[in-house]
From Swiss-Prot:
<feature type="site" description="Reactive bond for trypsin">
    <location>
        <begin position="64"/>
        <end position="65"/>
    </location>
</feature>
<dbReference type="InterPro" id="IPR002160">
    <property type="entry name" value="Prot_inh_Kunz-lg"/>
</dbReference>
<dbReference type="InterPro" id="IPR011065">
    <property type="entry name" value="Kunitz_inhibitor_STI-like_sf"/>
</dbReference>
<protein>
    <recommendedName>
        <fullName>Trypsin inhibitor DE5 alpha chain</fullName>
    </recommendedName>
</protein>
<dbReference type="Pfam" id="PF00197">
    <property type="entry name" value="Kunitz_legume"/>
</dbReference>
<keyword id="KW-0646">Protease inhibitor</keyword>
<keyword id="KW-0722">Serine protease inhibitor</keyword>
<feature type="disulfide bond">
    <location>
        <begin position="40"/>
        <end position="86"/>
    </location>
</feature>
<comment type="subunit">
    <text>Heterodimer of an alpha and a beta chain linked by a disulfide bond.</text>
</comment>
<keyword id="KW-1015">Disulfide bond</keyword>
<dbReference type="GO" id="GO:0004867">
    <property type="term" value="F:serine-type endopeptidase inhibitor activity"/>
</dbReference>
<comment type="function">
    <text>Inhibition of trypsin.</text>
</comment>
<comment type="similarity">
    <text>Belongs to the protease inhibitor I3 (leguminous Kunitz-type inhibitor) family.</text>
</comment>
């Protein structure tokens, strides 16, 4: 079964989408922020302002298919027009840090060393699920 965007269209493999909460009043879309002692915004966070759609994210799956279904493992990568200079050498692909389980932006050296995500139906909406490499994620 294919997944649908907010306009009722199938999610395209390699397509760019804003990831926002299913319900109003729960904050905005996903964006990057500095957390802890970071000098560069590498942490994926939810925008506090409901009006913010966040950053567009490209959803891609290795099989050359046209549309994405819930069974496919995805890479998620922000598509920021003008990334901060500290991120210019990164592809803005998401990773989950093992110890803290926080979603971060991977550096070039880390690109192939982490799991992937799936989009799963949840009630009348969808949720992102992280898949460890040994679970089938890359």
């Amino acid at each position: 079964r294919e997944l649908l965007d907010v306009d009722g269209n199938f999610l395209r493999n390699g397509g760019s989408y804003y990831i926002v909460p299913a319900f109003r009043g729960k904050g905005g879309g996903l964006e990057l922020a500095r957390t802890g002692s970071e000098t560069c915004p590498r942490t994926v966070v939810q925008a506090p302002a409901e009006q913010s759609r966040g950053l567009p994210a490209r959803l891609s799956t290795p099989p050359r298919i046209r549309y994405i279904g819930p069974e496919f493992y995805l890479t998620i990568e922000f598509e920021e027009q003008k990334p901060p200079s500290c991120l210019r050498d990164s592809n803005l692909q998401w990773k989950v840090e093992e110890e803290s389980q926080i979603v971060k932006i991977a550096s070039k050296e880390e690109e192939q060393l982490f799991g992937s995500f799936q989009i799963k139906p949840y009630r009348d909406d969808y949720k992102l699920v992280y898949c460890e490499p040994q679970q089938g994620g890359r």
